[in-house]
Amino acid sequence: MKLWVDADACPKVIRETIVRAAERTGVECTFVANHVVPVPKRANIHSLQVPAGFDIADNEIVRRVEPNDLVITSDIPLADEVITKGALALSSRGELYTKDTIKARLNIRDFMETMRSSGIQTGGPAALSQTERREFANHLDRILAKR
């Protein structure tokens, strides 16, 4: 199992949790972003900078991901693509996306996108709560323990 992080929008506190888990378990971890993501100098932790552009980082993750890898992302379409390839997808809020739940999440995302494009203010996501941070760390630990 390898860990792939969609680091463009990953909160710093979640990146720190991921780094600690990678250091503790030795799992190979790559942060993919269109900007420099500082990571500690460890043999198993990497940063991959891709060119700026729409979905460039997402496409690179999809290209490299393999079955049973874990992708950390809050990007629903990216989660759908990696699940289709046999990987796991975990949001930075601790939600494990599955084949059973991802289509409903895509429908909600598309509905909200339609609302926004028609001028309705939908607001952004709430700030990351302590409960969500804990949920993320717990899910990540459970997944890494099974590898």
From Swiss-Prot:
Q: Which InterPro entries does UniProt cross-reference here?
A: UPF0178
Q: Where does the record locate the signal sequence feature?
A: none
The record's annotation in HAMAP family points to: UPF0178
| Family designation | Belongs to the UPF0178 family.
Query: Organism source for this protein?
Result: Vibrio parahaemolyticus serotype O3:K6 (strain RIMD 2210633)
On the tree of life, the source organism's domain of life is Bacteria
Write down a Pfam family by its short name: DUF188
Please give the name of this protein: UPF0178 protein VP2328
